[in-house]
Swiss-Prot record:
The gene is HIS3. It comes from Candida glabrata (strain ATCC 2001 / BCRC 20586 / JCM 3761 / NBRC 0622 / NRRL Y-65 / CBS 138). Belongs to the imidazoleglycerol-phosphate dehydratase family. Keywords: Amino-acid biosynthesis, Histidine biosynthesis, Lyase. It catalyses: D-erythro-1-(imidazol-4-yl)glycerol 3-phosphate = 3-(imidazol-4-yl)-2-oxopropyl phosphate + H2O. InterPro entries: IGPD_sf, ImidazoleglycerolP_deHydtase, ImidazoleglycerP_deHydtase_CS, Ribosomal_Su5_D2-typ_SF. This is Imidazoleglycerol-phosphate dehydratase.
Length: 210
């Protein structure tokens, strides 16, 4: 499990993450909320940006994670700082929760449809952060979320998680569907990359991931 607290003049974020879907908690909610504790998968996302909450809930659900993420951001300006900082904080938590990349596949890929939309995601726990995100979104906003911030969120996450990711929406006419299928595909890819191999080794011919 990982816990991250990030406080700047633009955002106040805290999150708890368990990549195996175990119990997670925060000592005190910055939003004054109470979360029931349990042994099963727990997901509570409150960023102040509804569609971002929806995407992160899908990512956690299909990735098999337990996640509590709270953010108070300067949304009176716009959504940029909130979305970017949530990506940074989630990436930091992911890296901590993942730990040493030993005895796992390292590479993963996933496809996810949502009605007419189909997305593909490929990831590498390479310790070499890079993100290519091509979603082909046409709307300026989906709900309260600027569509330009969706790839930026994923880029921020990849940078702090120190993973390589390629996320592409292959087809689709509805931007909500295109985005959601992309996050679900990413969840599937990450879950596959974490699959144990049964060997206690670093999955690299170099012997290190760098």
């Amino acid at each position: 499990m990982a816990f991250v607290k990030r406080v700047t003049q633009e955002t106040n974020i805290q999150l708890a993450l368990d990549l195996d879907g175990g119990s997670v908690s925060v000592r005190e909610s910055i939003l004054g909320k109470e979360y029931a504790s349990g042994d099963g998968q727990t997901i509570h996302v409150h960023t102040g940006v509804g569609f971002l909450d929806h995407m992160l809930t899908a990512l956690a659900k299909h990735g098999g994670w337990s996640l509590i993420l709270e953010c108070i951001g300067d949304l009176h300006i716009d959504d940029h700082h909130t979305v970017e900082d949530c990506g940074i904080a989630l990436g930091q938590a992911f890296k901590e929760a993942l730990g040493s990349v030993r005895g796992i596949k390292r590479f993963g890929h996933g496809f996810a449809p949502l009605d007419e939309a189909l997305s593909r995601a490929v990831v590498d726990f390479s310790n070499r952060p890079f993100a290519v995100v091509e979603l082909g979104l046409k709307r300026e906003r989906i709900g309260q979320l600027s569509t330009e911030m969706i790839p930026h969120f994923l880029e921020s996450f990849a940078t702090e998680a120190r993973i390589t990711m390629h996320v592409d929406c292959l087809r689709g006419t509805n931007d909500h569907h295109r985005s959601e299928s992309a996050f679900k595909a990413l969840a599937i890819a990450i879950r596959e990359a974490r699959t144990p191999t049964g060997r206690d080794d670093v999955p690299s011919t170099k012997g290190v991931l760098a």
